[in-house]
């Protein structure tokens, strides 16, 4: 708790420092600085403010497309539009009217760029009717043209009001001139055209209609507003005031308000980011502290580093099992004891599974529960060390005699009874199957693989799970659908019942298939129950059993059928199962017929929680 409190204090301190910095951050420049940056553009007879900028008037003082250039020493003003330079002959600030002429037409016509230059319709509008004239050049010298001219490089040309000569000339471009300057005849005199082009065009800036008043600065001087473009729905310039004469080089500025709003919003965003990071880091710290506390509670259980794990397994040379969570290797401790080492896959998602398994196994001490000897928890490297059992897993020994299978089934029942009732905290295994039952040298069973186990208090009869866990064919119905009942320790009882029935059914699988070849893939508890009703156990048990073996086999069948009842409330608890297995056959009542329309499943296929084992030795 002290570390968490310290972290909270550090977070609060950082938050206060951040607020202090934002509070003292200069929001806007001084009035003198604003006047210096946005003083009017002056060149020759032209003095303008917004929306123009250029020279010593900064770019953010006007529209980005309206940059003016002062050409010295002639003190003439130019404006670049769509890549072509225009001479600005005059600007009327009150009416927002400009007189523009193409600079390349200011000299001899033959020196022009001979390209069309339509003005941008989003910035300008024509004030009077205009007409486009077509200039053809590089024409056929053998033909006669109206309004013809000759340029040294361009060759023979013609200026007309239509496209008459388009097929007779290689090149053409258009120029725009006022209609009043165009004569009635079709062809134009080149000298007359040069004069018209030098006089230029009159255009009006596209400013919104909200005008008619002067803006006033805080010191009472009349001037221009810098942030004139507001609420622009399209590309047009939109102003809240008219472009009027500028006095004293100052202007009214709403920038302080905008910058203040931006600063406040930025501060809020930064604070939110800081709080999120603090919360995230705090959650990670708490989770890590909880894991460490959980592992520290393991007491005398020895921890190993990853280097020691490699040495124990001789660099992971001998694989004895594979599973969904990791790989099991054979190893040997320094004292000579053989061990099995399960190395979990590098994954962020299996930390909880690792903690579950280590915590569950560390609480157990029973002859029918595999013994945990140590663990490794080094960053993303995690491993579990437990006793090595020579005879591997039960799925490789299902053909044993009935007496041995009965002893194994009873041992598994005692192990599960211990997990449910003998530990300080109840442990529900959730993955009972032949691959997770290991056999020692005396064929004594030991329940293994606690990767899906869940710990709960004994008074908790109902468990909450967010996923389906276990192996298909052994998973209790309530884990698939809550319509069958609540998930509890009775889910292990169902898996145990399927395990016991498989031990009996697998022993004579070939005989069953030969007896009914058309139904060999049927859900095997179905035909077990039918044989039980008909008092015919021949195809299941076979011949040559002693009376004691036959009693034990029938007892296993009855107990198994009791355990696989679909409703958890109809299943016996594990301590009752042990009592039934140890008692006499005559004391067992026939079980109700279970729901027998379970779809055919592959018993080796697993749910998303696990992958198929491919070994003679199951992972623990």
Curated annotation (Swiss-Prot):
Domain Protein kinase, residue spans: 314-596
Reactions mediated catalytically: L-seryl-[protein] + ATP = O-phospho-L-seryl-[protein] + ADP + H(+); L-threonyl-[protein] + ATP = O-phospho-L-threonyl-[protein] + ADP + H(+)
SUPFAM superfamilies: Protein kinase-like (PK-like) (SSF56112)
GO molecular function: ATP binding; polysaccharide binding; protein serine kinase activity; protein serine/threonine kinase activity
Residues the record lists as binding ATP: 320-328, 342
Stored InterPro entries: Kinase-like_dom_sf (IPR011009), LRK10/LRL21-25-like (IPR045874), Prot_kinase_dom (IPR000719), Protein_kinase_ATP_BS (IPR017441), Ser-Thr/Tyr_kinase_cat_dom (IPR001245), Ser/Thr_kinase_AS (IPR008271), WAK_GUB (IPR025287)
Name of the molecule in the record: LEAF RUST 10 DISEASE-RESISTANCE LOCUS RECEPTOR-LIKE PROTEIN KINASE-like 2.3
Start and end residues of each stretch annotated as Disordered: 586-620
Glycosylation-annotated residues: 75, 85, 93, 132, 148, 162, 189, 231, 248
Name of the encoding gene: LRK10L-2.3
Cytoplasmic face residues: 278-620
Membrane topology summary: Single-pass type I membrane protein
Highest taxon of the lineage: Eukaryota
